[in-house]
């Protein structure tokens, strides 16, 4: 039996302007209730075993359009995050003073590995052209995969991704940002013993660049609704 790969878990299906692998059969989703019938709930923390994107100042509806989601509909946090872990996409309402909107899923593109191409970079280039800036975060403990990236106006500013299962940095591009330096998260781009980025580091960088989704339940944010949809 071959070893489990990151690509087997987080599928690169959001390829904008690039050819995608043959899609799995899609199950039809039950019709979502209208927003007027939903009761907003309190934001919940998330992050482990997910990929999420961060957009500053965009509306959830604009992000859903940019991600080309199928059948986007209003969703509670509880249902939206459940859907994200089942392969759909949950887009949060604006969070914090800066109005960060996060989009979470297990089916966003991955940075690739020795056997698979980088599916994330083309999508992030396109999304940063649409929105001005997009941030990418991924953490999956089973494979010791931890990644963060920032793209601005179509260009990568910083990309770091470590696949501990292979002791490999699949991304190590751009200089560490001031936030990474302040956190002491400066990695050489090659393994030093078993020292590489971990899940805690991903959340720390997310909190410094935008917002740490694992802390949302502690922020006293008001009840709200997001948007859920299926990836293209």
Where are these regions (language model features)?
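Hydrophobic helical h-region of N-terminal Sec-dependent signal peptides
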Residues: 11-15, 19
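Bacterial signal peptide processing site
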Residues: 26-28
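Long, compositionally biased intrinsically disordered terminal regions
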Residues: 153, 157-232
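A general structural signal for short secondary-structure junctions and capping/turn motifs
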Residues: 2, 42-45, 127, 140
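Short, intrinsically disordered low-complexity segments
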Residues: 72-161
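Short, extreme N-terminal segment that most often corresponds to the first beta-strand
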Residues: 33-68, 229-231
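C-terminal motif of bacterial Sec signal peptides marking the signal peptidase cleavage site
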Residues: 20-24
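Bacterial N-terminal signal peptides that target proteins for export
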Residues: 1-11
């Amino acid at each position: 039996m071959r070893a489990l790969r990151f690509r087997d878990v987080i599928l690169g299906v959001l390829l904008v302007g690039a050819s995608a692998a043959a899609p799995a059969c899609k199950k039809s989703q039950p019709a979502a209730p209208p927003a007027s019938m939903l009761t907003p709930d309190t934001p919940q923390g998330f992050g482990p075993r997910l990929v999420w994107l961060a957009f500053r100042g965009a509306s959830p509806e604009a992000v859903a359009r940019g991600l080309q989601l199928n059948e986007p509909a209003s969703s509670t946090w509880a249902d939206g995050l459940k859907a994200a872990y089942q392969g759909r996409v949950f887009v949060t309402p604006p969070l914090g003073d800066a109005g960060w909107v996060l989009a979470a899923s297990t089916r966003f593109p991955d940075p690739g590995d020795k056997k698979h191409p980088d599916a994330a970079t083309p999508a992030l280039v396109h999304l940063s052209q649409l929105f001005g800036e997009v941030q990418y975060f991924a953490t999956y403990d089973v494979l010791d995969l931890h990644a963060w990236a920032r793209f601005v106006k179509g260009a990568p500013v910083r990309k770091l991704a470590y696949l501990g299962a292979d002791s490999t940095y699949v991304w190590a591009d751009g200089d560490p940002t001031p936030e990474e330096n302040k956190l002491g998260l400066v990695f050489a781009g090659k393994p030093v013993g078993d020292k590489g980025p971990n899940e805690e580091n991903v959340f720390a960088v997310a909190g410094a660049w935008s917002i740490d989704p694992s802390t949302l339940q502690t922020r006293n944010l008001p009840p709200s609704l997001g948007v859920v949809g299926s990836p293209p």
